[in-house]
Amino acid sequence: MRYIVSPQLVLQVGKGQEVERALYLTPYDYIDEKSPIYYFLRSHLNIQQPEIVKRHILLTLRMTQLKGYLGNLLDIKDDIIIYSHKNNLEYSYVDNTIFNPFVYTQKKTLLKNDSFLYNVYPGACDFLVIWVARACDTSIPEFGSYEDVDNNIIKFETMLMDVFPQLDLDITVESKFNNIFRTNLKLTGLKKIIQRVQDLDINYKSLLSRYDEHFINMTGNHFILNDEQLNLSIWDLDGTLALSSDGDTVMINNVKLFTDLVSDIDTQMERIKGDITYKVHLATPINSRIKLDIETSFIFIETATNNILLSSDKKISIILAKNHISIKVKNHIPNIEKYFTFLVIAINAMFNSVQKSADFTKVETVYWSRICQNTKNKNRKPVIINYLDPGMKKISNNFYRSDEKEVFINDNDIMFTCMDPLGKYNKVGFLNIFHDMRKYCIPCCFLHDQSHRSTFSSCVHQIDVEKKIVSPYILNFGKVVTESKMSFLPIIFDAFLNDGMTANMEQDNKRLKETSGYHIVRCCTGNDIVRLRTTSNIIQFVNEDKNILIVNDMVYFPMNASDIGKKIHILIQEIVHEVMIVKKKESSDKIDFFPPNYKLLKDLFPKQTIQTPIQSDAGMVLTTDGFYIDGKLFNEDLSSKYVTFTKNVITSDAVAKYFSPLFKYVISEAKDRFIKTWMINIMIHMNVDPNNIIPTLEKYYPNFGRVQIN
């Protein structure tokens, strides 16, 4: 998809706020008659032919920088006031009413700020209209000011316009990953979103649900509730969860849909804050080792790592790679990831158009000093030589070997060999971490022959290494695990599941050397990421997936012992991962994965019962395993436009005490969630005599529910 840089509009107004000049700013040579800016000009201002100016307001400017730029653009030397009809710019009222210098009121406190344009004008990437008035023409001339233009901004803009025609802005935004936002979207807002989905008639499935303190679920579109937990879920046409909100947070997988739904309705949502990461794929490669040759602090801040940039407010981080850019922002700003990608591509065209080769000798302090270092007893740093010894055998075009020496020749024809005075580290190999990240072949000295390693095959024989090959390094538990990684289990489960199993690690690091079998954590197979945000989500997932799930120090089982599958899942940062057994031979980097020993956890399953009817009528049967209609389990989500009231039933002390032994063991579900179920509520509604509660429980859950009775 080709990114189109949106036009911008600058309006200079006179004493009566009449438009004196209308400047249509664009990097293109024409007016986009389909753009919202042109529609606004024609329909609202009745201006058919604005001044077309080949310039561009950088959205990264502060208000003072913007004011200096606009004074230069309009050639105004007087004090000016800048404002907009859509958002507050340099001035705002304390209640966030839109400021207009021609309609000033002293009844509200006026605040001045010098924030960044894209922060105060969230829609600026798509629609930017700025009004400029001479301060003396307004009712508050004392609020005006004059700012000198930053010549570096003008210089950068000139270079930007010069290179713009040659920019390849074909990009694809692949993912929005950290998509849980903090908000305060309450009942009114949730119901308005539901109504908006229904009004749009877009065939998206929507569900408004609630659950009380007894975790009895109710679903529907209309409720009368008092401070009880709500959840709104909307699914895409393909069944993928597009957004979900519990009122305090909102998970957004489809940002465009969410923006469209709330753009013109009052959801009474005061804030929406959170992190979101975009991965933008580029049609044309860039130089990731970016170097800025002029002052550009009004756009980016350079970091110590030459492929990482920060926005001027340090709230947006940009990681550059050859074929893609990762952009992490603190708050959702529509299309900001595309705009920053445009700036990065432009800067590459300005300053980094020639792709330079990464000569290993020029980055010696980065790689050798940190990774492949010499110590008292280890000499792992390769040395550079000028010639090959006679009689060396050619292994490949860049690798030679003799009985005494191995030599690697990099792309710059520099020869590396290992000459350990102690005679130990004399085998040339390569650092996996840099090869995995950048395909750099960084030589290092090893104790043993490295020719069996996949990285060696890639660097020496140019054999493509499978992209999803798993690194033998095992991460500490707690980080999200990608396809090429694995991590340890939490300490308590590592000790339990790996009792009697061993994993030999290389000295001084967490690189797996050899194991005949060891339980670890892997990402789940397949392309779909499963997020579980609430206890309700966890229970639903376990019962539908029918496998064991570890969450923190708890183990969740499906409701029925007969349903338990052979997989073990584990939740890390709300993302479902998989527990597997890893096996590896010392002589190879190849890693094999096998199913876990699920029986270790299954044997701890605390509730084993046979299916027992509780009450039946007209083909409907309530059992200890669920509610059945004509023999079929009823598990449909209900959607109703009727108001429903339920009376909560308090679980008696006798019931809680009866089930208390269960909770000395691994917990299948939360205590209240297990005791206060439909079964308990209905049993009590059946007018069971309080004196007979224990006998009734023994009928349906004998022996505290731990032993199955045949």
From Swiss-Prot:
Q: What keywords does the record list, in alphabetical order?
A: Activator, DNA-binding, Transcription, Transcription regulation, Virion
InterPro entries xref list:
Poxvirus_early-TF_lsu
Q: List, alphabetically, the GO terms of the cellular component aspect.
A: virion component
Effect of mutating residue 134 to K: In strain: Garcia-1966
The GO biological-process annotations, alphabetized, read as:
positive regulation of DNA-templated transcription
Where is the protein localized? Virion
Q: Name one GO molecular function term.
A: DNA binding
Q: Which residues form a coiled coil?
A: none
Q: Does the keyword Transcription apply?
A: yes
Q: How does it assemble?
A: Heterodimer of a 70 kDa and a 82 kDa subunit. Part of the early transcription complex composed of ETF, RAP94/OPG109, and the DNA-directed RNA polymerase.
Query: What does the UniProt function comment say about this protein?
Result: Acts with RNA polymerase to initiate transcription from early gene promoters. Is recruited by the RPO-associated protein of 94 kDa RAP94/OPG109 to form the early transcription complex, which also contains the core RNA polymerase. ETF heterodimer binds to early gene promoters.
Protein family per UniProt: Belongs to the poxviridae VETF large subunit family.
- What protein is this chain from? Early transcription factor 82 kDa subunit
Annotated organism of origin:
Variola virus
What gene name does this entry carry? Answer: OPG133
